[in-house]
């Protein structure tokens, strides 16, 4: 009798702990369920040019900066997420496309020096420009006062989409009168790189101005654009590569009246502008 009574007392004392553990497991299952994705959400993006996450170009993460493009022959997705789950901000304003949810890197193509000042974060990391995204987020700082004073000239050669690239960037830095100006010009040209029937012609520009009134207030204006025309390549079957005796075969091009023509020519120009008022809050006042 005493043994049964003692066992009943022990069970009665352990019931709250067992109930709490069961409730914790249930909450854990509910939390995990909120992070489940359907197959359609994780499908591959048909547009290969947009498969790179905004985080790939992050220069403050050793791993991400080494698995990005960097003239590499392959692409990378952070944790396998589609690029629509990564957010790109410019001066604190989100620039993901409203229809596709993805950021078009053609919007800032050829402006490598002007867009070099950026901050990248992982999924839901603490930051000062967004609530976060499951694929991470990046913010490009185009404020003219944040560029170092001076000029830079860049000349590059390649045998891929374009053959030659030239960029020139000049910045006054923050002057004594509180003004700062930055400008950048770029041009990329290619007349058939390593793939036949591919041409590339792109001009890019950036102009930024900022007026710093005091330590707490400043007004910034930035405008940029990249008018581009590019001939595209289309995927082909292994049989087509075998018959052409080349893995660089492009079915999009051919001759018409003795001149080369391409069936898919993309002409893109999305001029953009951003105006921002920067207010540094003083917690002591």
Locate each region found by the language model.
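Short coil turns and loop connectors of transmembrane beta-barrels in diderm outer membranes
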Residues: 16, 84, 147, 175-177, ...
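Short, polar/charged loop or turn motifs at beta-strand boundaries
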Residues: 27-53, 65-66, 75-80
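Extracytoplasmic beta-strand/coil segments of soluble accessory domains associated
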Residues: 53-93, 123
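Short acidic/polar hinge/loop motifs at secondary-structure boundaries
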Residues: 55, 64, 93-124, 141-143, ...
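Extracytoplasmic loops and strand-loop junctions of Gram-negative outer membrane beta-barrel proteins
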Residues: 59, 120-122, 150-154, 188-192, ...
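Transmembrane beta-strand segments of Gram-negative outer membrane beta-barrel proteins
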Residues: 115-120, 135-137, 142-157, 181-185
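Transmembrane beta-barrel wall of Gram-negative outer-membrane proteins
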Residues: 152, 157-190, 194-233, 265, ...
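Outer-membrane beta-barrel and related beta-rich outer-membrane complex signature
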Residues: 195, 220-258
């Amino acid at each position: 009798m005493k043994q049964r009574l003692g066992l009943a007392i022990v069970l009665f004392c352990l019931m709250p702990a067992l109930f709490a553990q069961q409730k914790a497991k249930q909450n854990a299952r509910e939390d995990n369920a909120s992070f489940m994705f359907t197959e359609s959400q994780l499908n591959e993006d048909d547009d290969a040019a947009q498969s790179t996450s905004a985080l790939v170009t992050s220069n403050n993460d050793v791993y991400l900066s080494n698995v990005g493009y960097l003239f590499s022959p392959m692409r990378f997705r952070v944790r396998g997420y589609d690029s629509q789950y990564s957010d790109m901000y410019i001066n604190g304003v989100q620039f993901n496309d409203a229809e596709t949810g993805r950021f078009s890197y053609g919007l800032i193509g050829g402006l490598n020096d002007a867009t070099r000042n950026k901050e990248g974060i992982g999924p839901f990391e603490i930051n000062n420009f967004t609530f976060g995204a499951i694929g991470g987020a990046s913010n490009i700082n185009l404020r003219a006062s944040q560029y170092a004073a001076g000029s830079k000239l860049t000349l590059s050669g390649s045998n891929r989409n374009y053959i030659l690239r030239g960029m020139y960037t000049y910045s006054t830095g923050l002057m004594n009168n509180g003004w700062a100006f930055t400008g950048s010009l770029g041009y990329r040209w290619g007349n058939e790189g390593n793939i036949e029937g591919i041409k590339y012609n792109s001009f890019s520009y950036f102009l930024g101005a900022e007026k710093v009134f005091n330590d707490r207030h400043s007004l910034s204006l930035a405008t940029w654009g990249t008018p581009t025309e590019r001939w595209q390549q289309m995927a082909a079957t292994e049989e087509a590569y075998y018959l052409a005796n080349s893995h660089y075969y492009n079915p999009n091009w051919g001759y018409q009246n003795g001149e080369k023509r391409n069936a898919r020519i993309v002409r893109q120009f999305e001029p953009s502008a951003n105006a921002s008022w920067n207010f540094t809050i003083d917690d002591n006042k």
